[in-house]
């Protein structure tokens, strides 16, 4: 029997160690080390060690010790591969699972997890949600589509329960 999950969290596009991305996205941190520390602190303040968390890609680029970083983050961690996740990141021992795509049911919702926002997805017409990263909050979502990346989510993970259709520019409409 598996461990009890207290909460299910999602995040994407942390880009730990990626100084060029920090500047490009105008993230409000004075340095890459400061960004990394703030993102890790926000993650650990939100996610309990027993929680489940899905990272939807672009975990770390250029970080000096991604294995130690991952080990220091709370939760049972799963990775959906992003375009900036090489095999060295995908294969870290700290991931509970590591894959290109996932379909799962949590809290009564069928979820499609992929790094990229999809135009169409499995069970879309039956109410399934598409959770993604990659776009850093810059795309208008389709109904039931959510960018869970740190840029549009206050630089912290978000619980599935807090994703509300129609709640803002990075949330899908209830249609």
Regions found by a protein language model. Give the residues of each.
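Glycine-rich, phosphate-binding/catalytic loops in enzymes
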Residues: 26-28, 70-73, 130, 146-149
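Metal-dependent catalytic neighborhoods of phosphoester/phosphodiester hydrolases
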Residues: 57-73, 81, 86-98, 122-125, ...
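Short, conserved, surface-exposed binding loops centered on an aromatic residue
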Residues: 45-46, 68-73, 103
């Amino acid at each position: 029997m598996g461990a009890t999950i207290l909460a299910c969290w999602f995040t994407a596009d942390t880009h730990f160690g990626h100084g060029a991305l920090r500047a490009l996205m105008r993230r409000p941190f004075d340095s890459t080390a400061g960004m990394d520390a703030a993102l890790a602190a926000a993650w650990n303040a939100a996610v309990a060690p027993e929680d489940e968390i899905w990272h939807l890609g672009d975990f770390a680029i250029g970080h000096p010790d991604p294995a130690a970083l991952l080990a220091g983050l709370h939760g049972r961690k799963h990775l959906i591969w992003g375009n900036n996740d090489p095999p060295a990141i995908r294969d870290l021992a700290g991931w509970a699972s590591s894959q290109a795509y996932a379909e799962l049911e949590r809290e009564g919702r069928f979820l499609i997890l992929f790094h990229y926002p999809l135009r169409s997805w499995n069970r879309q017409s039956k109410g399934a949600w598409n959770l993604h990263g990659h776009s850093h909050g810059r795309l208008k979502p389709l109904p039931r589509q959510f960018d869970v990346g740190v840029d549009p989510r206050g630089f912290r993970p978000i619980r599935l329960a807090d994703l509300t259709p129609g709640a803002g520019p990075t949330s899908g409409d209830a249609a």
